[in-house]
């Protein structure tokens, strides 16, 4: 679709000329007969906050471990700061890593844990005090500098590990779900602070997470992975609004998947008829043009559905379930063909409450109904 092609050209123009911090070239990692990562190629640029996002077992942590040097690729090349990392041990790579395990020194207090790398590097004492103080303030540990890890909660221990990695100002910081032990409020606050810090110091962050909201909040770009392969690489808005395939559409937020057969095609628009006889208009992104008679899937986000309003596509439905979510209400709707539709309505205005069993119409615009094409990476 032209709007996606235009968006990707603009993104490419922004990236062009920026030095590459980490390059993965046709990287494959096998453990015996199991392929954890398959033919992965990525360019991650200097100063970029880049996330590897996917479900458990998709290969994202294995990818991070290959960049860090804890795993060697079976095939392909890992390049950091223009230098091949083949045979380079972890401690000689210009990266620091924060994994889910804290790995703190139990006999050292918070200050000394954070300062450990600086002391080994011969940083002057005054500079150590200043930088450790800044790092502790960043992760909300000011006043905890003289506590031992045994006197800290799990979340506080994770923040010490994060501060210790940041204080050395590496060229690339690798993070494997470092905020997982924090409570929800602090986690959201730390997301913004991590992003702000990354902008301030210019360090490339490569962040592994299964949390879609976390990735969307912090990332400049995201690589969505599944079964060892990259499904799509894009900025957060493009991933959400223009998913490349069904997996990305399903994994990034909620979506309604409509299956049908193409009846007509005109430009980027197509008419789809579902198995239940619904006739719907949709658009084909990525330059993909379905053929008449072709079986396709289309995706439309719940917030794009309007209950009781007009639109390109209007479907009679029955309210099956109502879920109050605070800022919005979620409606589970039963379509005439027996399919299920999910709609979200913002609770920002007075509106008649709908009840289960009530007959309603639900509408959405064709431009918000995307025919899902082939895989993109």
Swiss-Prot record:
Signal peptide (from-to): none
Q: Which keywords are on file for this protein?
A: ATP-binding, Cell membrane, Membrane, Nucleotide-binding, Translocase, Transport
Q: Which Pfam families match?
A: ABC_tran (PF00005), TOBE_2 (PF08402)
Tagged with keyword ATP-binding: yes
Q: Which reaction does it catalyse?
A: ATP + H2O + polyamine-[polyamine-binding protein]Side 1 = ADP + phosphate + polyamineSide 2 + [polyamine-binding protein]Side 1
Query: Which Enzyme Commission numbers does its entry carry?
Result: 7.6.2.11
Chain residues that bind ATP: 54-61
* PROSITE patterns, per the entry: ABC_TRANSPORTER_1, ABC_TRANSPORTER_2, POTA
**Residue limits of the ABC transporter domain?**
22-252
The family database entries (InterPro entries) matched by this protein are listed as:
AAA+_ATPase, ABC_SmlMolc_Importer, ABC_transporter-like_ATP-bd, ABC_transporter-like_CS, Mo/tungstate-bd_C_term_dom, NA-bd_OB-fold, P-loop_NTPase, PotA-like
Write down the SMART domains for this protein, in alphabetical order: AAA
Gene3D superfamilies, per this entry? 2.40.50.100, Nucleic acid-binding proteins (2.40.50.140), P-loop containing nucleotide triphosphate hydrolases (3.40.50.300)
Q: Which domain of life is it from?
A: Bacteria
Can you supply one Gene Ontology CC term for this chain's record?
ATP-binding cassette (ABC) transporter complex
Supply the enzyme class, top level.
Answer: translocase
Q: Which GO terms describe its molecular function?
A: ABC-type putrescine transporter activity; ATP binding; ATP hydrolysis activity
- Membrane topology, as annotated: Peripheral membrane protein
Kindly report the protein's main subcellular placement as a broad class.
Answer: membrane
Q: Its family?
A: Belongs to the ABC transporter superfamily. Spermidine/putrescine importer (TC 3.A.1.11.1) family.
Q: Main role?
A: Part of the ABC transporter complex PotABCD involved in spermidine/putrescine import. Responsible for energy coupling to the transport system.
* Quaternary data: The complex is composed of two ATP-binding proteins (PotA), two transmembrane proteins (PotB and PotC) and a solute-binding protein (PotD).
Question: What name does this protein carry?
Answer: Spermidine/putrescine import ATP-binding protein PotA
Species:
Rubrobacter xylanophilus (strain DSM 9941 / JCM 11954 / NBRC 16129 / PRD-1)
């Amino acid at each position: 679709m032209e709007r996606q092609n235009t968006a990707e050209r603009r993104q490419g123009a922004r990236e062009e000329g920026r030095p590459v911090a980490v390059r993965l070239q046709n990287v494959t990692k096998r453990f015996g007969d199991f392929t954890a990562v398959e033919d992965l190629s990525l360019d991650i640029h200097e100063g970029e906050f880049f996330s590897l996002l996917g479900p458990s077992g998709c290969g994202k942590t294995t990818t991070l471990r290959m960049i860090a040097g804890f795993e060697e690729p079976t095939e392909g090349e890992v390049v950091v700061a223009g230098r091949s990392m083949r045979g380079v041990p972890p401690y000689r790579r210009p990266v620091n890593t924060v994994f889910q395990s804290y790995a703190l020194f139990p006999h050292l207090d918070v200050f000394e844990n954070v300062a450990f790398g600086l002391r080994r590097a011969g940083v002057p004492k005054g500079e150590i005090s200043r930088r450790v103080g800044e790092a502790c303030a960043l992760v909300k540990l000011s006043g905890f500098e003289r506590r031992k890890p045994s006197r800290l909660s799990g979340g506080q221990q994770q923040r010490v590990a994060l501060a210790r990695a940041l204080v050395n100002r590496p060229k690339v910081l690798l993070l494997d779900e470092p905020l997982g032990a924090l409570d929800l409020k602090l986690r959201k606050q730390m997301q913004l602070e991590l992003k702000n810090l990354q902008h301030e110091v210019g360090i490339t962050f490569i962040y592994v997470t299964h949390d879609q909201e976390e990735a969307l909040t912090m990332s400049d770009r995201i690589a969505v992975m599944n079964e060892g392969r990259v499904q799509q690489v894009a900025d957060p808005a493009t991933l959400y609004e223009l998913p490349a395939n069904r997996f990305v559409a399903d994994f990034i937020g909620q979506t309604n998947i409509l299956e049908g057969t193409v009846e007509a095609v005109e430009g980027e628009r197509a008419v789809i008829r579902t198995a239940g006889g619904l006739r719907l208009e949709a658009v084909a992104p990525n330059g993909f043009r379905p053929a008449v008679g072709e079986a396709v899937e289309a995706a439309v986000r719940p917030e794009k559905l309007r209950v009781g309003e007009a639109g390109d596509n209007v479907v009679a439905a029955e309210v099956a379930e109502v879920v109050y979510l605070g800022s919005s209400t979620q409606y589970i709707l039963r379509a005439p063909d027996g399919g299920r539709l999910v709609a979200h309505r913002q609770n920002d205005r007075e509106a008649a409450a709908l009840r289960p069993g009530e007959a309603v119409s639900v509408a959405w615009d064709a431009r918000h109904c995307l025919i899902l094409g082939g895989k993109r990476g």
